[in-house]
Amino acid sequence: ADETCTDLTILTTQYIAGDFD
């Protein structure tokens, strides 16, 4: 669960940073 949480945080951070934009 911790790894999943970490992955989600990374994905969210990248999204906010516009990595997926």
From Swiss-Prot:
On the 2D-gel the determined MW of this unknown protein is: 33 kDa. This is Unknown 33 kDa protein.
